[in-house]
Amino acid sequence: MNIQEEIKKRRTFAIISHPDAGKTTITEQLLYFGGEIREAGTVKGKKTGTFAKSDWMDIEKQRGISVTSSVMQFDYDGKRVNXLDTPGHEDFSEDTYRTLMAVDAAVMVVDSAKGIEAQTXKLFEVVKHRGIPVFTFMNKLDRDGREPLDLLQELEEILGIASYPMNWPIGMGKAFEGLYDLYNQRLELYKGDERFASLEDGDKLFGSNPFYEQVKDDIELLNEAGNEFSEEAILAGELTPVFFGSALTNFGVQTFLETFLKFAPEPHGHKKTDGEIVDPYDKDFSGFVFKIQANMDPRHRDRIAFVRIVSGEFERGMSVNLPRTGKGAKLSNVTQFMAESRENVINAVAGDIIGVYDTGTYQVGDTLTVGKNKFEFEPLPTFTPEIFMKVSAKNVMKQKSFHKGIEQLVQEGAIQLYKNYQTGEYMLGAVGQLQFEVFKHRMEGEYNAEVVMNPMGKKTVRWIKPEDLDERMSSSRNXLAKDRFDQPVFLFENDFALRWFADKYPDVELEEKM
């Protein structure tokens, strides 16, 4: 295997969107074209019992929302594609943000009837901060939606990124006729036996169809006043190519995939803590853990650490360093994924995502290196939780299952664990309410441990250096706790309590996460 050639073939990207924009459906269609599934099962299949391939966890199947990041790999057009389907629900932004650290590009799915929605904007900010390319898919043209020019304007005004339409819709909803493909200079037809037609045939095909006349006017306007196409600007994350289509009817998706693979970047390097970039073509293997998932196979109660390979080649059975602990590990049981199905990996290269079976060795953010390399990559973002619950086992006889479940789910990074400094009582912290619901559901379903949860409301959280801590600083308005790494942390009742503390202890430095 020529490693350099293999790395050049890799395209690793995440799909981001607001809930219900059609993200899971387009993921299904991409897998369909990659030959990984025989038919695309959409989220709407909830009533029929056919579930989306990428929504594999029980609670996702029940609700039709993605609450964890699935990793899927397929080959298409000479490229090895690693697609990461991220959680669409805002409560799971932590998991999504970490996933966005492991990709080289993003596909942003937008509901053409709704335009840019809140979650899309939040996720776009993370992508923009990383400076990776964004490819936009305006979805649901099979339904009536907003004017294409309005959608482009909103994209530029709200997200602050220039856009270039790669195609343009001819009608929409019941009047949808197809796409005017500006990039490939052809027509893509929605109805009839022929998939494509030349632009010259447009007048003959559509006659005096008012929608086609409107398209010609719009394109003339775009040619005069629109942005110029620039591959350089796309790769710099300054220009987003915009594709229109319908994931549900699988229209425009294949053209999107082919064009995306043409322009999406090959694997990037990754920054170490000293600021130096590790090049993907470095011969030495390196990677980082961006996600840990327990119970991907409920029959085996397993844990998988998802690793983005940054450089070199992984070979089964290789020994790696874990600089955080100063210890080593052997990577013998390693898989690659198609949502819930997986296969053992013999080798993989920079850009690939591999799953390492984990018995509690790894944590989110860990760096893996080989040989004399003991460096660490820059830390992944961590988040300050906003709402808290006290949690305990409902049945004292189930304490062992309760502790195992809490330990594993916390290590996934899906929820944060704190202990009352004095009593040792468990408290959970989350970004949003849904995280608590998923935690409770999984504790009962996967660990057979019912839990009692009592709301503590919103808290303002700040970390304090152990050397600055005096337990007498704690009061009814600022409870003292330890995080899962035994670092002291204050849970302030509100901003007023925080300001009061800061005034009383001006020399004490309080730290806030993202």
Curated annotation (Swiss-Prot):
Cell compartments where the protein resides: Cytoplasm
InterPro entries, A to Z: EF-G-like_DII, EFG_III/V, G_TR_CS, P-loop_NTPase, PrfC, RF3_C, RF3_dom_3_sf, RF3_GTP-bd
Domain of life: Bacteria
Keywords (A to Z) from UniProt: Cytoplasm, GTP-binding, Nucleotide-binding, Protein biosynthesis
Pfam families, alphabetized: EF-G_D2, GTP_EFTU, RF3_C
Residues binding GTP: 17-24, 85-89, 139-142
MF-aspect GO terms: GTP binding; GTPase activity; translation release factor activity, codon nonspecific; translation release factor activity, codon specific
Gene Ontology cellular-component annotations: cytosol
Domain tr-type G: 8-268
Keyword Nucleotide-binding: yes
UniProt feature coiled coil, ranges: none
PROSITE patterns: G_TR_1, G_TR_2
GO biological process, one term: regulation of translational termination
Function: Increases the formation of ribosomal termination complexes and stimulates activities of RF-1 and RF-2. It binds guanine nucleotides and has strong preference for UGA stop codons. It may interact directly with the ribosome. The stimulation of RF-1 and RF-2 is significantly reduced by GTP and GDP, but not by GMP.
UniProt family annotation: Belongs to the TRAFAC class translation factor GTPase superfamily. Classic translation factor GTPase family. PrfC subfamily.
Record-linked NCBIfam families: prfC, PRK00741.1, small_GTP
Protein name: Peptide chain release factor 3
Gene symbol of the encoding locus: prfC
